[in-house]
Design a protein with these regions (language model features):
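Canonical tetratricopeptide repeat
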Residues: 53, 87, 120-124, 158-159, ...
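Residue-level recognition of tetratricopeptide repeat
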Residues: 47, 81, 115-118, 152-153, ...
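Structural marker of alpha-solenoid helical repeat scaffolds
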Residues: 43, 77, 111-114, 148, ...
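Register position in tetratricopeptide repeats
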Residues: 60, 94-95, 131-132, 166-167, ...
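Canonical positions in the second alpha-helix
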Residues: 40, 73-74, 107-111, 145, ...
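N-terminal leader/linker segments that initiate helical-solenoid repeat arrays
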Residues: 18-65, 69, 310
Length: 311
């Protein structure tokens, strides 16, 4: 018995330090590649491609200013360098320079040579417009992208569904997400579809799927949270509270303080909000913001805190 326990501890420790080592090696490799590209550029190989490659590595390290400078150099050398223009658009949007980002995205559309390239550029502009607070304009471009490329991509469906929510057309979200799931087979889209069913109060469709997952899944917290929302929506408050408390215990076991999964923190915050622990939910939201979680992760929790806190 002791040998088995020792072996498990040894394996866990090995995997843990291997993960830490891989992270360190990854950053070391990125810095080494930046060094190589810098030598090439300084020795006369100051091509658009080398500046673009170095910009990508700077972005990986979170050195956005350096990445932006290199992208400018790449575009000075090749004004039609689409990949560099796309990256520049994203950086400008992230910095809140929306007018410049929109102009940059429009140039990507103009330079597109194929329907596939043009549809992808349309999605880029839709993302910028959403960030700029113009969802009604953004959805025109995401709709056009699907007309040009009906199969789309996973992130296109997620973006379009989010835009539908922003323009208060929630009831259309399940259909687009279900179409995306059927087209791509993506589990991400399947789960987003189920979430949209719950949010749109289509409980009779959502609950059997959730119950099946609870029977078959080893990790159950996200499914218990979904079922709790259904129970709340159908007035089964005691059953919802039981699910939420069980869900919270599982999440607390699965969240590692040194390297927490952002989506698990968001789920835990949502559970606390639904249990009425608003201050604790706010702490999880603040933690997510501090560690740089994207808006799609924080938005549902923020919405729940505002909604429940105002009741």
């Amino acid at each position: 018995m002791m040998n088995t326990i020792s072996f498990k501890i040894h394996v866990f420790s090995s995997l843990f330090f291997l993960a830490l080592g891989s992270h360190a090696i990854s950053h070391h490799d990125t810095k080494a590649l930046i060094g190589k590209l810098t030598k090439r550029i300084d020795s006369g190989e100051s091509t658009a491609e080398n500046y673009y490659k170095r910009a990508i590595e700077y972005r990986v390290l979170g050195q956005i200013k350096e990445a932006e400078n290199d992208l400018k150099m790449a575009l000075e050398r090749n004004v039609n360098f689409t990949a560099a223009r796309r990256e520049m658009t994203r950086i400008l949007s992230k910095k809140g320079k929306y007018k410049l980002a929109i102009l940059s995205a429009e140039k990507v559309i103009i330079n597109a040579l194929t329907k596939r390239e043009k549809s992808s550029a349309m999605i880029l502009l839709a993302e910028v417009l959403l960030n700029a607070g113009e969802p009604s304009e953004a959805i025109k471009y995401s709709s056009t992208a699907f007309k040009l490329n009906p199969n789309g991509k996973i992130e296109w469906y997620l973006l379009h569904a989010r835009l539908l929510r922003e323009i208060k057309q929630d009831d259309e979200r399940p259909a687009i997400l279900h179409t995306g799931y059927q087209t791509t087979g993506s589990i991400v889209l399947r789960n987003a579809w189920i979430d949209s069913l719950v949010e749109c109060e289509q409980y009779e469709t959502a609950l059997p799927i959730i119950e099946k997952e609870l029977l078959e899944s080893r990790i159950k917290s996200s499914w218990r949270l979904r079922r709790a929302k259904v129970f709340i929506g159908t007035g089964k408050i005691n059953a919802a509270m039981d699910d939420l408390r069980t869900c919270l215990k599982e999440l607390d076991r699965r969240i590692y303080p040194k390297n927490p999964d952002m989506t698990l923190i968001a789920d835990r915050g949502l559970v606390h909000a639904l249990l009425g622990n608003i201050d604790t939910a706010k702490n999880d939201l603040a933690h997510l913001v501090q560690i740089g979680a994207d808006e799609w992760i924080t938005a549902p929790l923020e919405k729940a805190i505002d909604s429940i806190g105002n009741q």
